[in-house]
Amino acid sequence: MTLNEVSEGLYVAAKFSELTLDALENLQRSLKVPNPVPREKFHSTICYSRVNIPYVVASGSFEVANSGHLEVWKTDDGSTLVLVLDSDYLSCRHMYARALGATHDFPDYTPHITLSYNVGPLTYKGEVQIPVVLDREYKEPLKLNWSADLK
């Protein structure tokens, strides 16, 4: 790994099965979520590191969670609705990245899937039973302006 590669940062995320994508879309509809994240954008961030690391993506498709709960997080851009996942797998993959030297901008890692980046003044809470099945992990150079891809 060259110095340039180390300094460019690394992004790793999990993408989910069609079964999970269907369930997430149904959840958005049943909750009447404003500004829903499109199906093809559903993911769970595993690593958002300002330095590159030799992360090896996992292969295989299996359930990584079967439950979670809804939370609204206040962000610089508004109120974001997330499904916080009860996932030891995603937490372990994040710890693997940290063990390899990944940085992390927050005090804790919270595995989640964003359902909307802007729900306005609405609030959501409650437990959710949903099959969260990993389709694949992927990695790419870190994009600091990732929110521009959402528009």
Swiss-Prot record:
Classification via InterPro entries: Acb1-like_C (IPR056175), Cyclic_Pdiesterase (IPR009097)
Keyword Secreted applies: no
Alphabetical UniProt keywords: Host-virus interaction, Hydrolase, Inhibition of host innate immune response by virus, Viral immunoevasion
Binding site for 3',3'-cUAMP: 11, 140, 146
Positions bound to 3',3'-cGAMP: 11, 140, 146
Cystines in this chain: none
A molecular-function term among this protein's GO annotations: hydrolase activity
Gene Ontology BP annotations: symbiont-mediated suppression of host innate immune response
Active site, UniProt feature: 43, 45, 112, 114
Classification via Pfam families: Acb1
Top-level taxon of the source organism: Viruses
Catalytically driven reaction(s): 3',3'-cUAMP + H2O = U[3'-5']pAp[3'] + H(+); 3',3',3'-c-tri-AMP + H2O = A[3'-5']pA[3'-5']pAp[3'] + H(+); 3',3',3'-cAAG + H2O = G[3'-5']pA[3'-5']pAp[3'] + H(+); 3',3',3'-cAAG + H2O = A[3'-5']pG[3'-5']pAp[3'] + H(+)
Function: Counteracts the host CBASS antiviral defense system. Phosphodiesterase that enables metal-independent hydrolysis of the host cyclic di- and trinucleotide CBASS signals such as 3'3'-cGAMP, 3'3'cUA, and 3'3'3'-cAAA. Does not cleave cGG or cA4. Besides evasion of the CBASS system, might also enable evasion of the type III CRISPR systems that use cA3 signals.
Protein family (similarity comment): Belongs to the anti-CBASS protein Acb1 family.
Name of the molecule in the record: Anti-CBASS protein Acb1
Organism in which the protein naturally occurs: Shigella phage SP18
